[in-house]
Amino acid sequence: MFRLITLKIQNFGQFLSNMIMPNISIFITWGIMNSLFLSLDWQYNKIFAQLISPIIFYLLPILIGYTGGSLIAGQRGGLLGSITTIGMITSTDMPMFLGGMVAGPLGGWIIKGFDQIIKNRIKSGFEMLVNNFSIAIIGIFLTIFSFFFIGPFIEGVSKFLGCLIKIIIDFNLLPLIAFIIEPAKVFFLNNAINHGIFSPLGIQEISENKSSLFFLIESNPGPGLGILIACFFFGKEKSYKSSGTAAIVQFLGGIHEIYFSYVLIKPILMISLILGSMTSIFMLVFFKGGLIAAVSPGSILSILAMTKKGLYFANLISIFSSFLISFLSAMLFFKINLGQKIKNDKSSIQLFKNNLFPIKKIGDEKYDFIKKIKNFQKIKNIIIACDAGMGSSAMGASILRKKIKSNNLTHIYVSNIAINLLPKNADLVITHEKLTYLAKKRAPDAQHISLTNFLDSNFYTSLVKQLDLNKDFFKKNNIQDKKDRITQINIDSHKEIQSKCFFQISDKNIFLNQYAENKKEAIKIVGKHLVAQGYVKKDYIDAMLDREKIASTWLGESVALPHGTIKSKDSILKTGVIFCQFPKGVHFGETIDDIAYLVIGIAAKNNEHIMVVSNITNALDDKDVISKLSKTKSVKEVLSYLNVNVKKN
């Protein structure tokens, strides 16, 4: 439930952010003009100053309304969102940014619903007439509605928030919002907070004060920088070695997400973030600091560019003090080694993390959750599903099938499949934790297991052990004939796959000593090789990147298996596998330790790749082999470990 609520909040926050982010350059344009041409600033110019007001009162709200509508219903939604926003703009005398964020999606939803109602009901030749007049007529009603109702309502909400903020500031309580901001940021809600909440509030305030501290509350790089520097100097784990580079990227590049995983590794550092943020806000209030416009990304360079003349000291002291407090408190936690008992006890630290951040992890020494599965005796059909059914699920199925066979559990059939093709009569479905929700909708009567590591051999061993304990049930119930039939199905399926296996991995499919800064770059490298060898069309690379956004293709054990979405099958020309070695590693998973040294790209037509994946899986079942494959400089050695003959092309 917690994961579902978090996902809903993230999706809503992302939607709000998506209305602001495409227009952030216009915000910056307005901010620079505001700084340059208004009185008491750098270069007052009475003529140019006339350009500023229309941007904040008309252009920006309409752009937000258009963007919000287009996110729902494309261009038609954007047009209706724009005209709806006009109604609110003319009904008030304040910038209608919040109004645009309401009017845009409202217009989009209404025109989307209208289009669905009239779909396939318009006579040929009348499409353009209906499309144009529908926007005009609906737009008139929405404009009037927004003028009389939505505009005044948003104005009232804005005034209420303004009074509330004034009370908070008057009572010196503003620093306390750090208790909300910093934990929310670590859950990747930073853009939602900055662009969905603080940017509209900041613009509301800037019309009176010429600058606003709300623009700097979330975007301040100080607290995160303090965490990263403390990790670099005092963190003992290997995962902290990269924090020095991360600090440069975060401070100069403004990519705050880079420090979130370091906090999740050691949750006590959340206190350091909160203390740093509280210090920053206190300094901003005390010295009356702030920015003239929203900044994105939250880089020190962007912040300096958006700083009004006369506020450099206030803003810089705010950033520095937040860095100092965050760094010193984090150093203290590292020095006194708070929670030493938890650190030394692996099971306790997992429990500690799960209590603070209840994300279900598979990979503990004990798999007690497997025992919660009911009616092991009735499990005859196990399906491992992923979004496309060609990569991670194929590897997982290969490992489980091998263990099922070695334990002579011939009554159980193991298969892998795309999640949208899940049959409703499945007995047991195994999926990545981010896809389990979809799997339960497709197969509500099946039992479900979530995991994060498809190569976790211990998990499959524990599952098979429980299945093995219940195998006598079949003997007692005289269903040997069914066992024989299922066994024959397994044999026939295996022979069919072998007979159709036209693809064989060779030296042209192996690429050693590759380098990538991040997983996006690594996926592009793999995809480029798939395209170059004629396996896929060029748009398959975009499909691979889209697939990575759904859930990470990190398998565990230093291996990633990127592939396209189920919708991208038409972009596959023929089955192909690309094996790329990244000796320096690429961060692929959700935690800082999820580093892939082997990235295997797959494009599959039908089941032609299954035998190749099976061979790869057998090799990757041995950690020593994975280590050697990660370091070897010989293509022949790679092929030998993959149990195939060297075949030159």
Swiss-Prot record:
Keywords: Cell inner membrane, Cell membrane, Kinase, Membrane, Phosphoprotein, Phosphotransferase system, Sugar transport, Transferase, Transmembrane, Transmembrane helix, Transport. An intramolecular phosphotransfer takes places between His-563 and Cys-386. It is an enzyme of class 2 (transferase). It catalyses: D-mannitol(out) + N(pros)-phospho-L-histidyl-[protein] = D-mannitol 1-phosphate(in) + L-histidyl-[protein]. Disulfide bonds: none annotated. The keyword Ribosomal protein does not apply. Residues 12-340 form the PTS EIIC type-2 domain. Its EC number is 2.7.1.197. The modification Phosphohistidine is found at residue 563. The chain crosses the membrane at residues 24-45, 50-70, 134-155, 165-185, 273-292, 313-334. Pfam families: PTS_EIIA_2 (PF00359), PTS_EIIC (PF02378), PTS_IIB (PF02302). The EIIC type-2 domain forms the PTS system translocation channel and contains the specific substrate-binding site. The PTS EIIB type-2 domain is phosphorylated by phospho-EIIA on a cysteinyl residue. Then, it transfers the phosphoryl group to the sugar substrate concomitantly with the sugar uptake processed by the PTS EIIC type-2 domain. This is PTS system mannitol-specific EIICBA component. It comes from Buchnera aphidicola subsp. Schizaphis graminum (strain Sg).
